[in-house]
Amino acid sequence: MALSEDFTELQTLSNGRSSSIFPTTNTPVDPEEEEEQSVSACTQPNEHTQMMQTGQNGGLKSTRLSSSSSSSSQLTDAQRLAVLLPNALPPGFCVCCSLCCNGNQQDCALFQSAVPSAALHMGSCCVQGVPCFCMQHHWPEHLQNQPNMATLSPPRPFRFPKNYAELIADWPVVVLGICTVLIVVCALVGILVPDLPDFSNPLQGFEPRGTAIGQRLVTWNNMVKNTGYKATLANYPFKYADEQAKSHQDDRWSKDHYDRKKRQAEWDFSKDSFFCDVPGDSYSRIVFASAEGKNLWNIQAIKSMCNFDNTRVRSHPQYLDLCQRTTAASCCPSWTLGNYIAVLTNKSSCQKITERDVSHTLNILRSCAKFYHNGTLGPECWDMTTRKKDLKCGNLPRKCTKYNAVYQIFHFLVDKDFLNPKNTDYLPPNLKYSMLFAPTEKGETMMNIYLDNFENRNSSDGITTITGIEFGIKHSLFQDYLLTDTMYPAIAIVIVLVVMCVYTRSMFITLMTMFAIISSLIVSYFLYRVVFNFDFFPFMNLTALIILVGIGADDAFVLCDVWNYTKFDKPNSELSETVSITLQHAALSMFVTSFTTAAAFYANYVSNITAIRCFGVYAGTAILVNYILMVTWLPAVVVLHERYLVNLLTCSRTQNHQSQGAATFWTSLCQVVNKCLFSISEASRIFFEKVLPCVVIKLRYLWLLWFLALTVGGAYVVCVNPKMKLPSLELSEFQVFRSSHPFERYDAEYKKLFMFERVNHGEDLHMPITIIWGVTPIDSGDPLNPKNKGKLTLDTTFNIASPASQVWILNFCQKLRNQSFVYQSEEQDFTSCFMETFKQWMENQDCEEASVYPCCSQSTFPYRQDVFELCIKRAIMELDRSTIYHLDSKTPGPRFDINDTIRAIVLEFQSTYHFTLAYEKMHQFYREVDTWIQEELRDAPEGLSYGWFVSNLEFYDLQDSLSDGTLIAMALSVVVAFSVMLLTTWNIIISLYAIISIAGTIFVTVGSLVLLGWELNVLESVTISVAVGLSVDFAVHYGVAYRLAPEPDREGKVVFSLSRMGSAIAMAALTTFVAGAMMMPSTVLAYTQLGTFLMLIMCISWAFATFFFQCMCRLLGPQGTCGQIPLPKKLQCAERTSENQSTVNNQGKAGACYTTKHEHYELEPLAANVRNEGKASDEEQEACTQLQNNITSLHDDATLCASHEEPKHEFENGVQATEHSHLHQYAFNTRCTCENSMHQYIRERQRTACHPCGQSRETQCATKQSNHLPVCLNRDMIHAPTNSGHFQHCTPSQISRPAAHRCFSGGCGMHAVHISQQQTETESYISACVPSSSPQESQNRPAHLQFPDVQRCSSPDTTGVCTLNHDTQNAGELAINSQSPQKIPWNHLKTKANGTCVLQDCREVVPEDSIGCRVDKEKTVSPKKFNCFKKNVNAKCNSVEFHKTRTSVPTIAINSKASSESLC
């Protein structure tokens, strides 16, 4: 008992955190002080303590730091301790080491003051443990390096890396350097070599290429461009072309320009000294509405519009340089309602009008409205030269025609519903909108006026408000907004950085991850422009940044989690092995998510729209490049951080500093932050491991019905009513800003409300039918470059000069005029069918003049080929000389080449269809006309058999391409997602459920967008097609986790997948949701739409995957091999590393996988069939929890599916490879079973001098060995239990409530404690945690170091013992010889209801998938039974029961029988 005075009991907290406290005095520890110490323990490592360091390859090295403060008294204490324990404390004695998790550092000290840690030697057992989730634990504290330590290991010789993992582990700086060089080179080449993108025309690339209509439109446009003087085609013969070009080159103006000049000459207001011109489409304009929704026809509103004109437009400094003027002194007045009232009432300005003038003008408008609406009042009714009414409008009152003011008010300034014929004279007029025309040309010159006086200023004065603006700068302003609004993606990136930093607890890893994401865009731009040679870079490519931020963060979270799983599974492994295992699993998981999303983007390549195809290639490439960086750059960053940078930002302080009261503000702040983060992580753990599985499973029927109803509702909204609408705005009015922007409101709302806009945009014009022969409708340009439209391809078989062709064309024109879809004009159109005009001209020519012959009436139709070729040239030239009509590039008729040969002809008729944006009407028009023409061409002669027609079908083709391309892209995305899911899980049922979940997600998402008013335009098409790639990720993660779950039943698999993947999936969804939310304030429509879409798809896909998919798996999920694709036997259990393969030969037959038949969860709501056993006593619950809390394991080996072959006493079990028993929930060692723990223990004893022995706080654990006592403590988390070959019982009197999610204090224990010679030669593999020994032994060793006799393990308070049954067991049971060591799997150890510890037999079962176990019914040897258990407990290492704190939820026994809800 010499040491008992200096030592207190060695303790292991019930939550899995071991501690041993050895105060120098018997002064009790204050509970409150101890509680405070437990919170900050993790941040208080002793700087004198010899710590473990990570070597070059991740190996652990013992590092001893010298301390200048070491005193002689401390050395004396150490020497005295060595004298007291000459055999029990060899040089390899283990002392406390800093922990990864929130352990109590002060509890870890073996000798707080009496025996300083500087005098102790750190053994190899002091290896830092690894937690389970980054969300629930702290990243820097998970790493193998210890705080404030320096690596002093000797330099190792150069070793060339054998594989990629060793390259990452040994040469992370080299890998990072190579990646950095490549990124910099790609950036420089991508920026310097090709031209920078030009976003001045955002509509560029929005036209379809490659469609039948698209090829015709491209060919027609090329034909128009190549028609003219010295061009490929000409309207005139070449001999006359030069003369005609010279005489008409000054007249080749556009029709609008000509008409405008003509109107300017006709309507010259300069004599009236008021208006300079008439309002028109070329002038800047503003739309006003009442601020309170009232009538604008009142004097306050009219004067308010005049004030806006003076203060916002005319007062700008640049206005004087831009306005039109009659004199140098002043600018022309604006065309406003007030100025027109002033003209009609002879007032000088708008400010001079009165209420009487307004009423008088209204009366004039009332009396003249009917003349305007019936078409009799037109712009030509006033002769400005004579200042009198024109004779054409003699029946109209003069007041209606004076100055054409009434016509211009109705046509330009008021909305079309004002004073319409439907309103009677007795109803008050209702003017909703009025327009103001400024005497400035719209365009770039108006940019400064808009930016200074309109963009950020209030648009209302309380009376009127500016609702729409048309300055002609929409696309120019878009380019500026596109760059300035990148601040919102930047804000999103910053917020994602904060979330990642909190999640990983490492600023270095966070910044390097974001650098990898940005680098992905740079490298993909290089590949896009230089390697793929794409010349066109649409503005939509910029939105790839937002999507990539979410995906990159998801990959970082996955790698973080997998890294910690690997370190937890193999804490003693070298760094290269950790990297290898991490990449094996993380690379696959990241590849699944990256490939499915990239495939969804690449699927857009099937679209016919150039911008969508380019965006799909760029975004898909960026995601794949990001994946490559995530498996090269990011692992190297993690290794570099772990080896060198983990200690830079630590907030830990040594115990000496803490005791001296030298804690700084930052240390206190860091502790507070750590406590808050720990509380958050605890809440997260409870939610994802307890609450969420409970909610999902208990309410599964409700969730299924609810989400099925949502799916049906979404499908109804998308497909039936109101369904996804095609775009309703022309391409020229394509929306680029948010809907509330005044530029967009003018195009979308107000343009159709004013008559001059309706007429100019062709809503009252007939659709033309243009038919072409002689040119092949082929788009020979680059479909990925909207600027490259190719060259004109002529039809070599074309021949119009043959008599048969002449007759057929004439008959064709006559048939076409008789069709119902052709508009019959009253005026004779001599240009529609040139053959009719030519025949008539020939018949009217007199043959008396010899020079005319043969082009005269003597020649009969059809004409000879030579006559036709000669006379058609004369007819065209005569037509040009005798009429003022000029033939332009779009005029129907023949087209000549440079040799005067007719190479093409054009016919054009007007149809009865009016231009409309409605898809159905345009579709009917195209199908009807094209079908009739193709039917007629079947009987055409050989020279005219390849004709085709075209019309104003650009918008219809865009609509058609969007509707078809979106569906095809989504279908391809679904096929790829299903394929990837199938290859990942090898299970058809899981893959089918995932696709059903994705379908529901798509329907609900698109339905929500429809209800939000979305139309299927270009941007919407891209976002919707990408929905499949973004929504499949969550279902894939859950599906893979379901298949890898070791539990045999559905409920266990669902709980496993939810608890393991729930946190990472939620974080991925959160980061992407935040990135989308930050885009909402943007002005650019592409950003706001993408933000809306990301928020919706993340919420809906997470909900469907978590509740709908998991409930389907719980209800009808596959069990065993149901739905599994059969694989070759060699592949079923061959998933192993090279190191594992080398160990299999020594362990026995490879290929046998282990599982168990029953499992229990310690979560009451998850009980499928709860057995009502009445009220269990506290002792029962404590005993069951003690059994679970005292199980520990070695994680030094990744034991595979193999039955271990030893010379004697071999146990073999063969079951299916897909199920595993007693597996740690977060370990990657999916083939490891609890029965392997004994063999692991034997190998560990042979390999190390310090053996793990997990202990809880209430236990006193010592296992009697021949020469050594294994007392080194395991650092596993209490909620992540592990295996052991030792049975330990803990007395209920010492149980304390554990703090959840704590791990054992790493390294706190004793190393190779030599025992006196009273020991027996036998070894016991089953021992009680509170041992009892002979009195002599008790006197020679401390109370807590009592060693059990091989035959008994008793509690100090009882005489009950746990013995091995020496008798012959029943059939199928195993006889144990206690005098010889046996290899006893832990999962075969059971307790009877009377407390006896028995060993169950584990029979070899070949055809079945479970292990049969029987409870030994022999009576206990002990005369006094220790009633520790009253029911059998078969606890699996990976069950939920092991992951809970003992006091959180009471233990409930759950019937583990297979669910009756079976699919197979």
Swiss-Prot record:
Interacts with SHH; via the cholesterol anchor of the dually lipid-modified SHH (ShhNp). InterPro entries: Dispatched_Hh_regulator (IPR052081), HMGCR/SNAP/NPC1-like_SSD (IPR053958), MMPL_dom (IPR004869), SSD (IPR000731). Residues 9-28, 38-65 have a biased composition (Polar residues). It holds the Pfam family MMPL. Residues 468-640 form the SSD domain. Its main location: membrane. Glycans are attached at residues 346, 374, 458, 564, 608, 818, 899, 1140, 1190, 1394. This is Protein dispatched homolog 1. The chain crosses the membrane at residues 173-193, 482-502, 507-527, 531-551, 586-606, 620-640, 701-721, 970-990, 992-1012, 1022-1042, 1065-1085, 1089-1109.
